[in-house]
Swiss-Prot record:
This is U-stichotoxin-Hau2b. Its main location: secreted. Keywords: Cleavage on pair of basic residues, Disulfide bond, Hydroxylation, Nematocyst, Neurotoxin, Repeat, Secreted, Signal, Toxin. GO terms for cellular component: extracellular region; nematocyst. Neurotoxin that paralyzes freshwater crabs at high concentration. Disulfide bonds join 40-51, 43-58, 75-86, 78-93. It comes from Heteractis aurora (Banded sea anemone). Residues 1-18 form the signal peptide. Residues 19-29, 30-33, 62-64, 65-68 form a propeptide. It is found in: Secreted; Nematocyst. The lineage of its organism: Eukaryota, Metazoa, Cnidaria, Anthozoa, Hexacorallia.
Length: 96
């Protein structure tokens, strides 16, 4: 009678401690994002596991104002600037 009691005790212990089986296909897990530590700061943003420079965020791609063409030394006296040249101004100097 003892062997039957021991077998029954083991069987009942297994039933009490049994855990439900989990099918991995049914269980959906959200993937953890790859976060860089420390995170990308300033002019950089994260792509995968790397920090990439953002030229638009930091103003590297700005429309630059064209510099005026200034003659050095500037036109003086009876001359005025037209483009990159000094042109004689006959009205300014009283030649007319």
């Amino acid at each position: 009678m003892k062997p039957i009691f021991i077998v029954a005790l083991l069987f009942s212990t297994c039933l009490v401690n049994a855990k439900p089986s989990i099918d991995d296909a049914e269980m959906k897990r959200e993937p953890k994002p790859n976060i860089i530590n420390p995170p990308c700061i300033g002019c950089y943003y994260q792509v995968g596991n790397e920090c990439v420079y953002d030229k638009f965020k930091c103003g590297a791609v700005r429309k630059r104002e064209p510099k005026p063409n200034i003659i050095n030394p500037p036109c003086i006296g009876c001359y005025y600037q037209v483009g990159n040249e000094c042109v004689y101004d006959k009205f300014k100097c009283g030649a007319v």
